[in-house]
């Protein structure tokens, strides 16, 4: 089975999520699958750039490359999990915390953006739509 592991990439930053994705790909390959990481660069500031990156992620079609189907996509990080694939499931490592727990605690940088509340609502709506559309 050809599997794409979806995550965002912040250039020059590497941490636990990146190691998790690499280890997941390695394990899938060890079990006989053909797996690879599919990364999308992500910048979340200022707010209009965040909205652009959400749209850009949604516009990606990951169902095939070079005419060869990708059988499954595993979404790990926002907004990469918004990319289109008909057989997508989610192993959520990173939601956009500024729209969730950091917002609730008052620590979200998004709160200081003039469009912060609208962006938070957009993120919630995009996540709900993506998760609802998943066949899993």
Which residues make up each language-model segment?
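Short catalytic/ligand-binding loop motif for oxyanion handling, primarily in non-cytosolic enzymes
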Residues: 13-14, 44-47, 80-84, 97-100
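Active-site donor-binding segments of glycosyltransferases and PAPS-dependent sulfotransferases
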Residues: 31-80
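Structured loop/turn residues at beta-strand edges in well-structured enzyme cores
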Residues: 68, 83, 132-133
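Conserved acidic residues
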Residues: 71, 86, 135-136
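Membrane-proximal helix-turn-helix segments that form the acceptor-binding/catalytic region
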Residues: 109, 113-136
């Amino acid at each position: 089975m050809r599997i794409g592991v979806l995550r965002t990439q912040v250039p020059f930053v590497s941490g636990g999520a990146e190691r998790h994705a690499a280890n997941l790909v390695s394990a899938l390959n060890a079990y006989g699958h053909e797996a690879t990481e599919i990364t999308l660069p992500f910048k979340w500031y200022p707010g209009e750039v965040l909205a652009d990156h959400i749209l850009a992620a949604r516009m990606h079609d990951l169902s095939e490359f070079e005419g060869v189907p990708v059988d499954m996509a595993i979404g790990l990080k926002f907004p990469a999990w918004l990319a289109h694939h008909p057989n997508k499931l989610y192993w959520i490592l990173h939601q956009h915390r500024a729209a969730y727990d950091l917002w609730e605690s008052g620590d979200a940088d998004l709160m200081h953006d003039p469009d912060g509340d609208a962006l938070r609502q957009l993120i919630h709506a995009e996540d709900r739509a993506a998760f609802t559309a998943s066949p899993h």
